[in-house]
Amino acid sequence: MDKYIVNGRIGEGAHGIVLRGIDKSSMKVVAMKRIALKNINEQGLPNSAVRELLALRLIRHDYVANLVDYFSQGYSLVLVCEYLPIDLNEFLRANVKPLAISHVKSYMWMLASAVEYIHSLHIMHRDLKPANLLIGFRGELKVTDFGLCRVFRNPELVGSTNAEKDQQLFTHQVASRWYRAPELLYGSRTYGPEVDLWAIGCIFGEMLKNSPLFPGENDIGQLCTVIQVLGTPDEEIWPGVSSLPDFHKISFTSTKKQVSFNEILTEVDESSRIMLERFLRYCPKSRITAQEVLEAAYFQQEPLMTPLNDLPLPIEKPLNTATAEFANWDWSATHF
């Protein structure tokens, strides 16, 4: 089914190439994620592709880049989603100064709304970062790229008699380093949706500061940057930390906070710094939840959120539209 015209490359990541296309029937612009399927006859669809497809089919939210269509093409799975012209990372880099607090509040509200809904479906995103947050032509922010998502069990439905047996095991090699929660850096395989809240806190701080909050060069360096601000974790502030797989493999001299958020965010109001601290806590269970974010008094305090219609509009980035790149692509599609 020759339904789409491909007219440019948006980007490329670990999970596939993202192209800009046009739906011939509606003439709407769409984003098309092409995921290569290796050895499909022997192994079937990769788990990551299945999870992303199932999640996108389930999720319908104003602040998620929703799935429009999907189909197989040769040895590829193509996910067709609504098109948004720029991501938050590009948007922030294009601004010399940090965003206005009222703008930051609006983006945080939209992000928390999306994540609260995603978590209500018992799905962890596990790769929240500015590059996976898109900004649309109306100024709205939407979550994208569910390539690392996983379903987590409802804690209320998990029995307590065989707690160890009931635990889900996940890989800790998820999330981009600068947004990776401490439990992941220490090798935890039994984490939960709190990893997304840590990532949101890092994104929040980056919007306030206009540069990454914890820019570590490697995993150990990442822990160092966090420890400089939060101090060395111990059992008192993070019960169970000493039992994490890599805790004793990485030794740090016990230290208190060396740099405070007041020093990092010198021109940020106190209420924003207090709100940020609620995300960036070592103990996962002490972190604010997405639902609590939406209920926080922070959003009712001055300055109030900028209305959607008054948010800055993105400038669409130039695309790679070299025709030779797409000349030999057969986009006749077989729908599942």
Regions found by a protein language model. Name each.
Residues 17-38:
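Glycine-rich ATP phosphate-binding loop
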Residues 34-60:
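Conserved N-lobe beta3->alphaC-helix segment of eukaryotic protein kinase catalytic domains
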Residues 107-108:
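Activation segment signature within eukaryotic-like protein kinase domains
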Residues 232-277:
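C-terminal lobe substrate-recognition/regulatory segment of protein kinase catalytic domains
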Residues 304-336:
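C-terminal intrinsically disordered, low-complexity extensions immediately downstream
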